[in-house]
From Swiss-Prot:
Free-text activity regulation comment from the record: Inhibited at high fructose.
Official protein name in the record: Fructokinase-2
Function comment: May play an important role in maintaining the flux of carbon towards starch formation. May also be involved in a sugar-sensing pathway.
EC numbers, comma separated: 2.7.1.4
UniProtKB keywords: ATP-binding, Carbohydrate metabolism, Kinase, Nucleotide-binding, Transferase
GO CC annotations, alphabetized: cytosol
Highest taxon, organism lineage: Eukaryota
């Protein structure tokens, strides 16, 4: 499948190609020098983040149609983030402001290999306070794909809002896309995280998990296919496991396989999984026959691997998101 190029942007703007992302958007503070602890870091670079918002921006940057639903503090950071969504051509009509809570912050420790550790300030932050009554369910029902993570499941009232939006999407025949995006420091305990993440597992049509998340959820070796397949259920259309720079594995009812990744100079892995998901959802929204056509799926996953790889070459998530041209260039150079 050819990913959306310049000629596909107009078609993507049609509402039947709309991907609505639900959840959190926050400010990541990334150290200006990798390999130091938060206490040792001399300075930090401010970067917009939050997995569902990263996905929305990734889709729009690739010429797709995306919207974001979530709540922000009525503060400078909150307004800055919503403006960033708009600047990235993301529909922000589902964005709300809370006068009594702050926008969430995260301090990110960068290891020498670009992997990360997080320290969050969100107790409670505005995104946690979104209520069911505040939802724009009309926007959700207009989507071709409804995408979400698990952080919005951690506490009320956001959990109830998440469940209501998901129910509305399913009732309207919208495809449900789930990337758990495990962040253990935000959950009361690892067991609570596992239980919460799996509580909505069987509602999804498409699930993307990392190899580390497979290991966490199954308490087993992510390289053992038996453990991966324990996450499969009847009704799931596609399960994708991302394996970092090694690429990804895919599983459908009728076929399974793997697609190799791309070698790049990794600086910061923040947002790589979101770039991967966003690029895949652009293609799913455009043509969901990729769930049944292995050749199309493999081509789409190759493009997604390229998008994820490119995102690791700069600090921060949204600023590092690829364009169609940069992804195609990486693919061409690797051939």
């Amino acid at each position: 499948m050819a990913p959306l190029g310049d000629g596909g942007a107009a078609a993507a703007a049609a509402s039947n190609n709309l991907v609505v992302s639900f959840g959190e958007m926050l400010i990541d503070f990334v150290p200006d020098v990798a390999g130091l602890s938060l206490a040792e870091s001399g300075g930090f670079v401010k970067a917009p983040g939050g997995a569902p918002a990263n996905v929305a921006c990734a889709i729009a940057k690739l010429g797709g149609s995306s919207a974001f639903v979530g709540k922000f503090g009525d503060d400078e950071f909150g307004h800055m983030l919503v403006n960033i969504l708009k600047q990235n051509n993301v529909n922000a009509e589902g964005c709300l402001f809370d006068k009594h809570a702050r926008t969430a912050l995260a301090f990110v420790t960068l290891k020498h290999d670009g992997e990360r550790e997080f320290m969050f300030y969100r107790n409670p932050s505005a995104d946690m306070l979104l209520t069911e009554a505040e939802l724009d369910l009309g926007l959700v029902r207009r989507a071709r794909v409804f995408h979400y993570g698990s952080i919005s499941l951690i506490s009320e009232p956001c959990r109830s809002a998440h469940m209501a939006a998901m129910r509305a999407a399913k009732a309207a025949g919208v495809l449900c896309s789930y990337d758990p995006n495990v962040r253990l420091p935000l959950w009361p305990s690892p067991d609570a995280a596992r239980e919460g993440i799996l509580s909505i597992w069987k509602e999804a049509d498409f699930i993307k998990v990392s190899d580390d998340e497979v290991a966490f959820l199954t308490r087993g070796d992510a390289n053992d296919e038996k453990n991966v397949l324990s996450l499969w259920f009847d009704g799931l259309k596609l399960l994708v496991v991302t394996d970092g720079d090694k690429g990804c594995r895919y599983f459908t009812k009728d076929f399974k396989g793997s697609v190799p990744g791309f070698k790049v100079d990794t600086v910061d892995t923040t947002g790589a999984g979101d770039a991967f998901v966003g690029s895949l959802l652009v293609n799913v929204a455009k043509d969901d026959s990729i769930f049944h056509n292995e050749e199309k799926l493999r081509e789409a996953l190759k493009f997604s691997n390229a998008c994820g790889a490119i995102c690791t070459t700069k600090k921060g998530a949204i600023p590092a998101l690829p364009t169609v041209a940069t992804a195609q260039d990486l693919i061409a150079k690797a051939n």
